[in-house]
Regions:
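Non-catalytic signal-transmission and effector/linker regions of two-component phosphorelay proteins
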Residues: 1-10, 113-127
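Acidic, metal-coordinating helix/loop segments flanking the phosphotransfer/catalytic sites
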Residues: 37-55, 117-119
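Acidic catalytic/metal-coordinating carboxylates
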Residues: 39-43, 66-72
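Receiver (REC) domain active-site loop signature in two-component systems and cognate sites
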Residues: 62
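Hydrophobic/aromatic residues positioned on beta-strands within the core alpha/beta folds
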Residues: 86-88
Length: 127
């Protein structure tokens, strides 16, 4: 199991599903992350005015501002462009899904053992 110094890494989790948000936040907290959560892309952008997360995990399909729009905004902002972004999606469209089209650094399918995927993705993203 990936274990980081308890105060060393901050993650921002963005998902409109309370169940997914809770699952991902709990998973990260158990591995020593400090975690902040938002329910949509607009709320996440507001939080990022004062937060400097080490990683952002975001759903793709959300109301108000989708994950695709959030990722685009983050990658176009020099202040947040280098933060690793993990996109969560229940969709897989052909060879490229919405996460890849949005320029996410990593993507995870919600329908397949999300915790195992998070474990391996965090190891890649944060070493």
């Amino acid at each position: 199991m990936l274990k980081l110094e308890s105060s060393s890494k901050l993650a921002l989790v963005v998902d409109d599903s309370m169940l997914i948000r809770h699952t991902v936040c709990r998973f990260l907290e158990e591995r020593g992350f400090q975690v902040e959560a938002a329910t949509n892309g607009l709320e996440a952008l507001e939080m990022l005015a004062t937060l400097e997360p080490d990683i952002i995990i975001t759903d793709i399909q959300m109301p108000r501002m989708s994950g695709v729009e959030l990722i685009s905004a983050l990658k176009n902002d020099p202040r947040t462009a280098e933060i690793p972004i993990v996109a969560l999606s229940s969709l897989k469209c052909g060879a490229r899904g919405p996460a890849e089209d949005a320029r996410a650094d990593f993507s995870i399918l919600k329908d397949i053992d999300i915790e195992a995927q998070l474990e391996s993705t965090l190891a890649l993203a944060l070493g």
